[in-house]
């Protein structure tokens, strides 16, 4: 249903920008977060705010929300200055912060009441508004449930409802799609488009460029500077004619991508199923005229990577010197070894894994195997049972039934010994926020049982590799997101495990950071490391050799990314994406 947006008496002229910033500077001590940017937010549209970690996106949103004062320059929202004129502007602005801004120990209804109190809504107004918002978000059956017990998609809806309590004319969304599955993101877009149709202006900050492509306009920030202001299509057009798809030999997509990145003429190369997407440098197109290179339409991510300097090249220092986890020839991919290694034991094996919580079955007879050098993806909607399966495989949760082994060790009989052979990078990165970077490295080295000499060597190597030296004394919770990710990967790999479990490892990071991360992971597979990953980001799932799709605790599909896409190909959808396959397969089961 559409959500009515009440008109206001002081509506601005139709062409007046919903917000504008002029020569805007915001500094925190010696750190310049925004360096003199000027831009206008068109009314009645969705504007995407993109840029790498530390670009200044959240700072800009907080300035627009009236939560900060600029160091210099000006901010206008709905024709007025935030934090001035009796808070009128803030009353007409809705703000949904990262992680949705919810109080997880309060119920859905209590969260709504808390935000209604902050908006000073009287009893009549909140009764009407609650009824509208609960219908709009489909949360009416869950008003008594604690926010912390909601799925990611339901938390997202509740965060949006809280931001909409004041019937805002400007809605500020700070990475609303992080940590939620494609079905939930699609539902969020439906709701936001309805709001825009009713006259609301939306600023949508995102690390996912396919989300930004849906926006009417984008602002691209980097290091506090505005690099681009305009329609996303115009930015994508800058690389038209320079984007190609190269079909890789069977099982060699990772090696093909790495080969492309060694070429001086290549700006970017990423895996897409059994193919590699290649972006050529200007004036180098003639080098890609062979039959193996098929021209394809550009996308925003291609232009974004070019504008920020291209993908990082060179060998992964993390993989150098890594002890081989299995008898795997250096550089060979999982599929190349599959025939020769068919008789070898899987490094990860799950058979009939089941976990019940009372009458609720969170995981229902889940089974799969992962061999040395293979990347296996566990995909599914929020609440499908992925994290439960993950925790059982890591020895953190005892199965109700079934068996699991890691690196040849049975988790039911020797969970602690199995945990010593795996690395686990959990959601939110498993770091101890009140410990410093150095203390986190020291702690994880100790719990993994490294000798004093090995600990000294490995910790020093990680500090150099991930450029952590300037942050060693900083508390982990205060690190920028990209450095939290680096530290988490360092802690998970200090002991050179045979198996890596990655639970949404790049959630919320930009494409360049994602490429850096997967550059290391792909290199580790050449050393025989087996990888199991969960992700809600379908472009990332393309890096997997095989995918298991989980829904309501059961594995409903398994195959390569291309095999899953082929299952939903039709005349109406001749070139389905992995997100198309995800949604179609889930909806097919739900029908």
Where are the predicted features?
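Helix-to-loop junction immediately C-terminal to a conserved catalytic motif
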Residues: 65, 394
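Conserved ABC transporter NBD signature motif
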Residues: 73-84, 88-89, 402-410, 417-418
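Conserved ABC ATPase "signature" region
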Residues: 113, 117, 124-142, 442, ...
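Catalytic Walker B motif of ABC-type/P-loop ATPase nucleotide-binding domains
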Residues: 171-175, 500-503
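ABC transporter nucleotide-binding domain
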Residues: 190-281, 517-533, 538-591
């Amino acid at each position: 249903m559409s959500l009515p947006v009440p008109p206001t008496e002081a509506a601005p002229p139709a062409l007046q920008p919903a917000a504008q910033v002029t020569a805007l500077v915001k500094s925190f001590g010696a750190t310049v977060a925004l360096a003199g940017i000027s831009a206008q937010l068109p009314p009645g549209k969705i504007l995407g705010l993109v840029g790498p970690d530390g670009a200044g996106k959240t700072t800009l949103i907080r300035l627009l929300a009236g939560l900060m004062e600029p160091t210099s320059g000006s901010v206008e929202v709905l024709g007025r200055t935030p934090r001035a004129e009796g808070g009128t502007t803030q009353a007409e602005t809705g703000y949904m912060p990262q992680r949705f801004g919810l109080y997880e120990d309060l119920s859905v209804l209590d969260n709504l009441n808390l935000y209604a109190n902050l908006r000073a809504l009287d009893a009549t107004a909140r009764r009407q508004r609650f009824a509208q918002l609960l219908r709009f978000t489909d949360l009416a059956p869950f008003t008594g449930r604690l926010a912390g017990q909601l799925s990611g998609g339901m938390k997202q809806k509740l965060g949006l409802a809280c931001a909409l309590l004041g019937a805002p004319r400007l809605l500020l969304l700070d990475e609303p799609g992080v940590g939620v599955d494609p079905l939930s993101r699609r539902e969020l877009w439906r709701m936001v488009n309805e709001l825009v149709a009713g006259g609301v202006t939306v600023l949508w900050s995102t690390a996912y460029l396919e989300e930004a492509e849906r926006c009417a306009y984008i602002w691209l920030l980097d290091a506090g500077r505005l690099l681009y202001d305009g329609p996303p299509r115009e930015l994508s057009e800058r690389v038209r004619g320079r984007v190609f798809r190269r079909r890789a030999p069977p099982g060699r997509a990772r090696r093909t991508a790495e080969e492309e990145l060694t070429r001086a003429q290549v700006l970017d190369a990423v895996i897409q199923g059994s193919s590699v997407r290649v972006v050529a440098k200007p004036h180098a197109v003639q080098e890609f005229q062979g039959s193996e290179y098929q021209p394809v339409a550009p996308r925003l991510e291609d232009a974004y990577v070019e504008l920020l300097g291209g993908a990082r090249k060179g060998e992964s220092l993390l993989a150098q010197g890594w002890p081989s986890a299995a008898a795997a020839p250096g550089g060979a991919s999982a599929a190349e070894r599959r025939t020769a290694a068919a008789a070898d034991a899987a490094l990860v094996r799950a058979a009939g894994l089941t976990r019940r919580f009372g009458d609720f079955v969170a995981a229902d007879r889940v089974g799969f195997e992962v061999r040395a050098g293979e990347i296996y993806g566990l995909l599914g909607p929020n609440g499908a049972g992925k994290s439960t399966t993950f925790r059982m495989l890591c020895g953190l949760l005892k199965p109700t039934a079934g068996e699991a082994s890691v690196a040849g060790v049975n988790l039911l009989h020797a969970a602690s010994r199995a945990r010593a052979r795996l690395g686990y990078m959990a959601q939110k990165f498993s770091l101890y926020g009140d410990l410093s970077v150095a203390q986190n490295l020291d702690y994880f080295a100790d719990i993994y049982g490294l000798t004093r000499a090995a600990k000294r060597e490995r910790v020093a190597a990680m500090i150099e590799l991930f450029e952590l030296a300037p942050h060693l004394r900083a508390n982990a919770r205060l690190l920028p997101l990209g450095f939290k990710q680096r530290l988490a990967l360092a802690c998970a790999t200090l002991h050179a495990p045979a198996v890596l479990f990655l639970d949404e490892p790049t959630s919320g990071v930009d494409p360049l950071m994602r490429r850096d991360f997967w550059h290391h992971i792909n290199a580790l597979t050449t050393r025989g490391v087996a990888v199991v990953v969960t992700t809600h980001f379908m472009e990332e799932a393309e890096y997997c050799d095989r995918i298991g799709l989980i829904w309501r605790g059961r594995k409903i599909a398994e195959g390569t990314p291309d095999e899953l896409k082929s299952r939903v190909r039709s005349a109406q959808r001749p070139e389905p994406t992995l997100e198309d396959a995800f949604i179609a397969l889930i909806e097919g089961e739900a029908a």
